[in-house]
Amino acid sequence: MAKERHSVGVIGAPFSKGQPRRGVEEGPKYLREAGLIEKLREFGNDVRDCGDLDFPDVPNDTPFNNVKNPRTVGKATEILANAVTAVKKADKTCQSIGGDHSLAVGTIAGHAAVHPNLCVVWVDAHADINTPSTSPCGNLHGQPLSFLMKELKAKMPAVPGFEWVKPCLRSKDIVYIGLRDVDPGEHYILKTLGIKYLSMIEVDYLKDDKVMEETLEYLVGKHKRPIHLSFDIDGLDPSIAPATGTPCPGGRTYREGRILHEQLHKTGLLSGVDTIWMESTSRGETKRDVEVTVKTALDMTLSCFGKAREGFHAST
């Protein structure tokens, strides 16, 4: 298959303060060491590596109610949003590498600043749409979408550090794929707002092509618009992605993951990609666990930019 040339901007976001344990900030380093930049170029893509962002700790970052590290996370997501906006203004597909999933506040808000009509495919075991009042633990990695949803604006307190965020999504702008660990407060939000999701129950009963057929028909069937893929590695089964912060059994297989990413690529509408939450051995994962997870994450990411299981060559 001949692959069209892409213009890609890669941003590293080595950040872990959206949750309490370190290790996830190693994700950008691991994907680069695995050859992400070189392999993207091998497919004929024009790639600009924007390097890793620097995220300063905010002093005296006391909890806001039960929300932990609010100012540090808020500042990090603002820095990332500005970087994503710059990549999109340069007319490049933005590939962001995390990092924990609190970063999605920045990647999606930064993308929407240039393409306000975007839609989101959220691949994850978790819904990540708790509000500060529904979150059982106060960790912001489980709350990014609540800051972005227009329908939740009235429910959101003024969390310090997030003053810059303007909600940019409506319920019709997002589809979840692979949910299987959803908090009660999140389930209530999904049902109340009518957000479309294909949990692992639906995924198990639908054929692989039907999952993406439903997703794409819902989001871009009538009106073509930019797609933002926010991909948490724990959306896949731990057997193929064991080194992640919140593994959850019963996830998507390697084959199912590749199909999803390949089909998103084929739309020609993929405009932003997050690859989120690969852990390091500092968390107790074995070297083999990390290697398997990074290889899986690399293959999924490259599938968004032209890598196909049938083989490929760059167009001339």
Curated annotation (Swiss-Prot):
PANTHER family: ARGINASE, ARGINASE-1. Pathway: Nitrogen metabolism; urea cycle; L-ornithine and urea from L-arginine: step 1/1. Mn(2+) 2 binds at residues 124, 126, 232, 234. Homotrimer. Induction: Slow-response activation by thyroid hormone (T3). Strongest expression in liver. Binds 2 manganese ions per subunit. Its cofactor is Mn(2+). Signal peptide: none annotated. Gene3D superfamilies: Ureohydrolase domain (3.40.800.10). It is an enzyme of class 3 (hydrolase). Mn(2+) 1 binds at residues 101, 124, 128, 232. This is Arginase-1. Residues 1-26 are annotated as: Disordered. It holds the Pfam family Arginase. Belongs to the arginase family. SUPFAM superfamilies: Arginase/deacetylase. GO terms for cellular component: cytoplasm; cytosol; nucleus. It catalyses: L-arginine + H2O = urea + L-ornithine. Keywords: Arginine metabolism, Hydrolase, Manganese, Metal-binding, Urea cycle. GO terms for molecular function: arginase activity; manganese ion binding. The lineage of its organism: Eukaryota, Metazoa, Chordata, Craniata, Vertebrata. One of its GO terms (biological process) is arginine catabolic process to ornithine. Its EC number is 3.5.3.1. CDD domains: Arginase (cd09989).
